[in-house]
Amino acid sequence: MLKKRACDGAVPCYTGFHPHLLIEKNYYASCLTDEEDNLIQIKEKYSFEKDKTKAKHSPGVYYFKDGATLKKYCQMLVDANETLNGEFYASLPYNYMVNDGKKVWVPTNVDKFCQWGTPEDMADYLFWTECTRRF
């Protein structure tokens, strides 16, 4: 499907319920798209929808059409020193791609995944792992 879309990058997303959406704080990246699911903007620790179950959230999976594209746009992010809380995020090079007119597709076909990208995620995982060991 990526070849058919002829995209320079892709950010697969999920919509609907996920347990981490129950808390008020936003821990993950959200995508704003046009009517053809092309990325307009990606923003970390944010939801473009008040009802977060309607937003397109990234589970942390990213596609670049080749290594040169990855290197170029990650370098642009670093050169601009665009950080959040002093950290660089793998999602943010896509904004530079969009600004350059590159096509970034945002399919919403992620049905099942485990999200362990933050220390809080890891603590939840360890908690539930220990709970299930007891049975």
Regions found by a protein language model. Give the residues of each.
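Conserved beta-loop-beta/alpha segment of the NTase-like Rossmann-fold superfamily
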Residues: M1-S30, E35
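Catalytic-core segments of class I nucleotidyltransferases/pyrophosphorylases
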Residues: N38-F113, E120-A123, F127-R134
